[in-house]
């Protein structure tokens, strides 16, 4: 059997729509696609560690309690490119995809509160797989093709409140929506008709996240920061249509449809159990910070509709361990630009929870990045890089090596702040 991976990604963006870009991963075939990191470029550049951070001018999406510490109105948007090198043990294929990953606005309120809202990429589907089977004499006997594209987005609204005793609490509400198209075709040598199965589905639902953040002053400069974030149990509904038909086998998948074998509608449910993020670290405000984060969740549950009678893959418990930090030599330096640059780095190891052919699909990565100041203000251009590996080529599976580049722009201003009159 020979696997050949071809991935095509398209991003369409307008003021009225945020269209999902496809992933470049064959693992996006499973469930509702690849789960995108719901974190800022700054957080991902520190090994995805961010739950203990509470900046006055940067958004941390991990913990909504951090919004209570905002002092500046902050507008951010981000995009990136992911390059995958996939290996099935016999062949390698390189593919890439680019996407706008988030747009968000954070607004301070009354000095101890903050609001944040925006649009984020949530999951991404994008794959094109070719399986070929040959007879003993080397003659091509059968071809199976698998196509998929789409995914989900989320609109969120977060609120944080900072109490006088260094404790902050936060809440985030989100609406998830999107669509996924999947196509499977089969052609056999010397058989006049091929078969094709089409699945089109729409997904929607709501999620709720709670957060808490505490700062303990160890001395005049050093602080200990602790963050806890909890995604409450949520359910997404997936509704769609399935169509199975025959087509004239003309040597490709462009044959003319002949007969409809089956046409049906379906409803599926995706249940996401409670997800907990524990994060802690210490450092000096606007100077340096080092921290660790542990995330864990019980298995996702896919039931009904297109997920009935699936036995070659399942979901187990999810967990992620991150360690990372940042360093800014001198934030207010007037003579040396590079002393005002913030340098970030981190590592992470993740058990994705996906199990295929009784084999766990795990992932690890190394990340680093910089925040480049724009002039003498707090606005920054953030660059992030990530190198890692997911999966294995053992047990007839695919190993994925990925190289991610991310870019975000963080603009800060004094909107809605009362001017002092002397």
Where are these predicted regions, by residue range?
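Bacterial Sec-dependent N-terminal signal peptides
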Residues: 1-24, 422
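Subset of outer-membrane beta-barrel
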Residues: 20-422
């Amino acid at each position: 059997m020979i696997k050949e991976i071809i991935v095509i990604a398209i991003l369409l963006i307008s003021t009225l729509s945020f269209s999902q870009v496809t992933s470049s991963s064959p693992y996006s075939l499973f469930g509702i696609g690849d789960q995108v990191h719901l974190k800022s470029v700054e957080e991902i550049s520190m090994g995805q560690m961010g739950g203990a951070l509470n900046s006055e001018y940067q958004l941390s999406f991990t913990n909504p309690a951090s919004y209570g510490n905002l002092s500046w109105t902050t507008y951010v948007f981000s995009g990136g490119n992911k390059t995958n090198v996939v290996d099935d043990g016999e062949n390698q294929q390189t593919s890439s995809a680019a996407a706008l990953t988030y747009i968000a606005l954070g607004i301070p309120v009354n000095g101890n509160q903050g609001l944040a809202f925006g649009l984020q990429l949530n999951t991404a589907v994008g794959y094109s797989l070719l399986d070929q089977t040959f007879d003993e004499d080397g003659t091509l006997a059968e071809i199976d093709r698998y196509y998929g594209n789409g995914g989900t987005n989320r609109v969120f609204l977060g609120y944080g409140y900072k109490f006088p005793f260094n404790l902050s609490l936060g809440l985030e509400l989100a609406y998830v929506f999107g669509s996924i198209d999947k196509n499977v075709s089969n052609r056999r040598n010397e058989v006049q008709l091929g078969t094709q199965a089409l699945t089109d589905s729409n997904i929607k639902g709501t999620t709720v996240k709670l957060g808490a953040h505490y700062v303990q002053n160890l001395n005049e400069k050093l602080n200990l920061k602790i963050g806890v974030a909890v995604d409450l149990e949520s359910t997404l509904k997936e509704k769609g249509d399935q169509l199975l038909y025959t087509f004239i086998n003309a040597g490709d998948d462009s044959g003319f449809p002949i007969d409809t074998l089956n046409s049906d509608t379906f409803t599926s449910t995706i249940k996401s159990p409670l997800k907990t993020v524990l994060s802690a670290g210490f450092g000096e405000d606007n100077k340096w910070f080092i921290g660790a984060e542990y995330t864990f969740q019980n298995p996702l549950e896919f039931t009904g509709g297109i997920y009935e009678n699936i036995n070659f893959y399942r979901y187990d418990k999810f967990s992620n361990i991150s360690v990372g930090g940042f360093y800014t030599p001198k934030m207010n330096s007037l003579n040396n630009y590079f002393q005002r640059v913030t340098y970030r780095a981190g590592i992470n190891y993740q058990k994705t929870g996906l199990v295929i052919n009784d084999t766990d699909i795990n992932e690890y990565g190394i990340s680093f990045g910089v925040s480049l100041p724009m002039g003498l203000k707090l606005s920054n251009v953030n660059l992030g890089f990530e190198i890692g590996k997911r999966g294995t080529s053992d047990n007839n599976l695919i190993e994925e090596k990925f190289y991610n580049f991310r870019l975000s722009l963080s603009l800060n201003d004094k909107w809605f702040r009362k001017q002092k009159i002397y």
